[in-house]
Each structure stands twice: as structure tokens, then as C-alpha cells.
């Protein structure tokens, strides 16, 4: 009998699968793909719609010590951006998150991901000027990539795929979050890159 890989998916609405169901979130679909390939995966997805880095630090990171994950995915930042976080504050929060992951799960493989370009969503205009929002998303993603690299985490750049999905209008009725098909495409790409 194989020892299960312990997969902890940290994040916000894009991780829990808002716009579909948690069972169709990208971590759940990714775990299913790996199971189909014979891997034994125990997934924990504590992500919550609306979470920012403060919430992740307070509510999700304590699970590291209990779960002792062998794999961690990290996708966080959209709500920091919406709440007006500065780039410096976002960076310092990511440093704290990566340090805590390394301290509490030193042997885990960490895969950091970008946030999608939600400025392309039908509801994107509700958050301000679309060009300004798109530029901030790109800067936040650059910071996330830099801090992932600095921490020794893997950066999987799904942003080109995510942006193409946005341009094609791959949104559920909420007009903001990715569709079930979009999340599944993220999972398939991750399965190709991060096996």
C-alpha cells in the first residue's frame, strides 16, 4: 500500500473553485488526474472565497503543521489587490507565507501560481479602470513569481492560458470567476508541467 502524497492547496476563490463546486476546483481536478495515473493523493483545500494574504496566514497556514504536506500550491493576491494593498505589503506578506511554509513543511514541493486576469471578466469594471486593474494584476503576479523564486518554490506561469480564457469569455454566471472548464484546463496544464 502506498503512502499518500499530502496535497495542501492554499488560496482564495480561485483555489476553492468559486464559479463551480469545490469538487471541480483546479486542485480537486489535478488530484483526480494524478489518481488516474496511479498516484495516491490526499487533498486538503482550505481556501475561502474572499481571502487575502492576512486571512491565509491566520486561517490556512496553521494547517501546515497538522497536515505535513508533501505538496503545496499557493495562489493568493486578488483580494489583496481589491482591498488596495500596496505592492510592498503584498511582497512582505508573500515572504511571510513562504517562510512559514518552509519552516512547517520543509520537505514539501511548493508550486506558486499567478492570479488570472480578472479585469477581462464581465464584472471586472466594478473594481475600477480595467487597464489599471490589468496592470496591477501583472505587477502582483511579477511579485508572486519573484518571491516564489526567492523561496525556492516552483513558479508555474498559467497566466497566458488564464488570459486567453478571459479573452474567450470563459466565465460562469457570476461574471468574475473562471468556469468549470477553465479550472479543468489549469489542472491539466499543471499535470503536464508539475508531475
Spans of features found by a protein language model:
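Serine-esterase "nucleophile elbow" of acetyl-processing enzymes
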Residues: 1-49, 59-68, 184
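Short active-site-adjacent helix-start/loop capping segments
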Residues: 17, 52-55, 80-83
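Conserved donor sugar-nucleotide recognition element shared by glycan-biosynthetic enzymes
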Residues: 23-26, 53, 137-140
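Short, flexible loop segments at the rims of nucleotide/cofactor-binding pockets, characterized by
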Residues: 48-53, 132-133
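Alpha-helical cap/lid subdomain in secreted, periplasmic
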Residues: 58-195
Amino acid at each position: 500500500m502506498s503512502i499518500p502524497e499530502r496535497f495542501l492547496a492554499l488560496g482564495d476563490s480561485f483555489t476553492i473553485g468559486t464559479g463551480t463546486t469545490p469538487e471541480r476546483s483546479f486542485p480537486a481536478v489535478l488530484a483526480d488526474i494524478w489518481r488516474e495515473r496511479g498516484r495516491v493523493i490526499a487533498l486538503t483545500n482550505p481556501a475561502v472565497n474572499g481571502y487575502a494574504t492576512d486571512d491565509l496566514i491566520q486561517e490556512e497556514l496553521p494547517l501546515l503543521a497538522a497536515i505535513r504536506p508533501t505538496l503545496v500550491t499557493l495562489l493568493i493576491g486578488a483580494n489583496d489587490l481589491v482591498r488596495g494593498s500596496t505592492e510592498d505589503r503584498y511582497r512582505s506578506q508573500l515572504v511571510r507565507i513562504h517562510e512559514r511554509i518552509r519552516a512547517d513543511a520543509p520537505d514539501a514541493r511548493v508550486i506558486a501560481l499567478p492570479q488570472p486576469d480578472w479585469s477581462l471578466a464581465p464584472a471586472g469594471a466594478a473594481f475600477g479602470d480595467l487597464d489599471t486593474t490589468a496592470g496591477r494584476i501583472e505587477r502582483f503576479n511579477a511579485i508572486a513569481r519573484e518571491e516564489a523564486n526567492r523561496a525556492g518554490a516552483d513558479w508555474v506561469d498559467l497566466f497566458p492560458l488564464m488570459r486567453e480564457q478571459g479573452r474567450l469569455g470563459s466565465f460562469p454566471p457570476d461574471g468574475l470567476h473562471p468556469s468549470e472548464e477553465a479550472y479543468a484546463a489549469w489542472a491539466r496544464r499543471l499535470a503536464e508541467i508539475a508531475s
